[in-house]
């Protein structure tokens, strides 16, 4: 059983970054909206909890609250920004609006020996409009800054800690070490979340679910669908049939490259469908991006259903959905967070879907998908040069985007 950390999301746009930083430590974690039913979160059997930041104030009516099971569990807790305020507020501390909002670089002074932070001055990234004025019983001040009397607090005997700053962003140089101390030393989570363990777990789950039934894989030629197809093929072999849809929007020679790659490198039975007329006909005259995504998603599914009827009984459809696809497609009411966009794998699925979905990458970030694809345990290499080049560009862009995201002006409480 993989040791895990549960991250409760209180509406922060940094929450995915927290999860990525924890997984970079080879510790598995999952993100849950703060109001997720307790049994769903506790089924993860976490070794500890991280409470994200958020745009609310704990003293406002309707602000997200701390679920009772978090403190009742006796497990370690790390509150970040709003998460620290919420833990303090729930335990009898006092949180008030600050005279001035603080956004940007700051220097804290760690004044007390503790398990979380080394002594001395440290650069951090602040983003808050409230501050903690009175500590809850049992807590002490671990760090201060000129404008923040409680930059970090802790109750070591209860293994509860809070920080006003954001350790997850790269502007806090010591943030990775802080998260490592919390996840591995305080929570004692074993760093076992590796590409090989991901593959082993996925293959076991796919075999158990599919049994002797047949599976269609939606192949786009990109990295996500390639890795998803390779994982399922490793699990069930010839029970898998890949379907590549030529929708008329491909790169030059992409169809030929995909056909060659999947036949030669993966040994997957691949069917190529010429659906250019259907896709372009449905997209003709449509300018709204969300409507386009829905049209593309539904047209893909209808195309797969038509191929399944030709092939006989098909029970499952494989998609290369990854974790950001799911999070970014969340509705605007989720944690009061703004919907970014719907992904055609998620928001575009019709309600009368004829297949059960298999999404082996659903809980993986893009960098984890890349690492799985490079593992010797999966027969995906050599990745076709065309896909590898395309992936390299995407990987670099996503890396740049991740750094930019951690710099976005987003004042939390």
Q: What annotation goes with each model-predicted range?
A:
Residues 1-48, 55-59, 65, 71-73, ...:
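RNA-binding accessory domains that recognize and position tRNA/RNA substrates
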Residues 53-57, 322-325:
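Short glycine-rich anion-binding loops that position phosphate/pyrophosphate groups of nucleotides
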Residues 83, 168, 322-323:
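Catalytic metal-binding/acid-base residues of hydrolase active sites
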Residues 79, 83, 88:
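Gly/Ala-rich beta-loop-alpha elbow adjacent to hydrolase catalytic centers
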């Amino acid at each position: 059983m993989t040791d895990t950390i549960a991250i409760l999301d209180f509406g922060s746009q940094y929450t995915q970054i927290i999860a990525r930083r924890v997984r970079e430590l080879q510790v598995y974690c999952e993100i849950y909206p703060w109001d997720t039913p307790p049994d769903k979160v506790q089924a993860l059997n976490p070794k500890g909890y991280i409470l994200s930041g958020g745009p609310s104030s704990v003293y406002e009516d309707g602000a997200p609250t701390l679920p009772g099971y978090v403190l009742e569990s006796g497990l370690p807790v790390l509150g970040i920004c709003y998460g620290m305020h919420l833990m303090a507020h729930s335990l009898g501390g006092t949180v008030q609006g600050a005279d001035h909002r603080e956004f940007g670089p700051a220097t804290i002074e760690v004044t007390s020996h503790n398990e979380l932070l080394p002594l001395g001055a440290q650069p951090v990234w602040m983003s808050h409009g409230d501050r903690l004025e009175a500590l809850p019983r049992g807590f002490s001040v671990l760090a201060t800054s000129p404008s923040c009397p409680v930059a970090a607090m802790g109750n070591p005997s209860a293994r509860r800690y809070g920080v006003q700053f954001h350790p997850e962003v790269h502007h806090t140089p010591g943030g990775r070490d802080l998260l490592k101390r919390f996840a591995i030393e305080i929570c004692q989570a074993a760093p076992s979340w590796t590409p090989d363990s991901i593959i082993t777990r996925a293959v076991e789950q796919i075999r158990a679910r599919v049994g002797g039934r047949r599976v269609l894989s939606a192949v786009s030629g990109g990295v996500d669908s390639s890795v998803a197809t390779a994982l399922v093929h490793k699990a069930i072999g010839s029970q898998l049939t890949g379907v590549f849809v030529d929708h008329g929007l491909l790169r030059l020679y992409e169809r030929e490259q995909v056909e060659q790659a999947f036949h030669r490198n993966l040994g997957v039975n691949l069917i190529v469908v010429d659906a250019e007329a259907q896709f372009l006909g449905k997209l003709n005259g449509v300018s709204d991006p969300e409507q386009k995504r829905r049209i593309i998603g539904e047209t893909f599914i209808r195309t797969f259903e038509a191929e399944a009827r030709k092939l006989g009984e098909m029970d499952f459809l494989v998609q290369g959905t990854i974790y950001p696809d799911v999070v970014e497609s969340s509705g605007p009411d989720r944690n009061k967070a703004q919907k970014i966009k719907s992904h055609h794998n998620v928001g575009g699925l019709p309600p009368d879907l004829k297949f059960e979905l298999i999404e082996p990458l659903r809980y993986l970030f893009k960098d984890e998908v890349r690492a799985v694809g490079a593992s010797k345990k999966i027969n995906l290499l050599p990745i076709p040069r065309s896909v590898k080049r395309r992936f390299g560009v995407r990987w670099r862009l996503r890396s740049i985007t991740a750094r930019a995201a951690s710099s976005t002006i987003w004042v939390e409480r």
